[in-house]
A protein has these predicted regions:
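Low-complexity, intrinsically disordered Gly/Pro/Thr-rich segments
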Residues: 218-226
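Outer-membrane beta-barrel "beta-signal"
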Residues: 229-243
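C-terminal closing repeat unit and adjoining cap/tail of repeat-based domains
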Residues: 190-214, 228
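Detector for outer-membrane/organellar transmembrane beta-barrel domains
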Residues: 55, 61-190
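Surface-exposed coil loops of outer-membrane beta-barrel proteins
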Residues: 1-60, 128-140
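Short proline/glycine-enriched turn/loop segments at secondary-structure junctions
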Residues: 180-181, 225-228
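Transmembrane beta-strands of outer-membrane beta-barrel proteins
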Residues: 33-37, 74-78, 112-116, 168-170, ...
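Short loop/turn motifs that connect adjacent beta-strands in outer-membrane beta-barrel proteins
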Residues: 28-29, 161-162, 197-203
Length: 243
């Protein structure tokens, strides 16, 4: 896994409700995947929504992985049919995300690289989104937050006798689908270290920094923008134990 991809991609489907998934047998290094959700979030989705109807957010995806020797590659395409009763999404086109990635294990460590193109996605997903990328009109409570763009991330894991050193660096360029002057460029990097205390217990630490350069709406219903440059940093320390 690549540390930091959620911070620079435009769509992450990590957890979904009501999913049917299929994984094909691996043949000549290729493994195919497919999944579908008739209601991606039954607890926090739109009220009065009905599963497998246009009132809910529906999702589908296809993926393929190729693994042979030191090389592993993946490709996925994901589709989102947004709810037609949520004010923010009822007029939006279907969302799409195409992701390509891979890693290669060298003698010194493993190198990771991944990229994603996304279009008509509802909100940028990263938890450290300091300033929402949105357009607000006075006449409507709805916020236009449909975004498009692309992101890249590269990572490195270097194993040593004392543990693993981890590094990642990524960027994202995004804009509102209907208001291209409202946009954001992000650069994010992180370093980490994990040390196995035993076969079941691992201690880990990491530090990261994220910088945004954004053109945001200066006032509700205004077409004027103002440049803001928020940033965030964090340090974590933790321990995991497998039972």
């Amino acid at each position: 896994h690549i540390a930091g991809y959620k911070n620079v991609f435009g769509f992450n489907s990590g957890r979904l409700d009501n999913v049917v998934a299929y994984k094909a047998p691996t043949v000549d290094g290729f493994t195919f995947y497919a999944q579908y959700s008739g209601n991606t979030d039954q607890y926090q989705g739109p009220e009065d929504a009905v599963e497998n109807k246009a009132s809910v957010d529906r999702y589908g995806s296809l993926g393929v992985k190729f693994a042979r020797g030191a090389l592993t590659t993946i490709a996925t395409i994901e589709w989102s049919d947004w709810s037609n009763i949520r004010a923010d999404t009822k007029h939006a086109d279907d969302g799409i995300a195409v992701t390509l990635g891979g890693n290669y294990k060298f003698d010194f460590g493993t190198v990771y690289l991944a990229g994603q193109y996304f279009d008509n996605q509802w909100k940028l997903p990263s938890p450290s989104e300091i300033v929402p990328l949105q357009f607000v009109a006075n006449a409507s409570p709805a916020k236009d937050r449909m975004v498009k763009g692309y992101g890249f991330v590269t990572g490195l894991k270097v194993p040593t006798a004392q543990g693993d050193f981890l590094f990642s660096l990524g960027m994202r360029d995004a804009q509102l689908v209907n208001h291209s002057n409202i946009n954001a460029m992000r650069v994010s990097g992180s370093v980490g270290y994990r040390y196995p205390l035993s076969q079941r217990t691992v201690i880990y630490t990491a530090a990261s920094y994220t910088h945004d350069s954004m053109n945001k709406q200066s006032a509700a219903s205004s077409s004027d923008t103002v440049k803001v440059k928020p940033n965030a940093s964090q340090v974590v320390l933790g321990l995991t134990h497998a039972f």
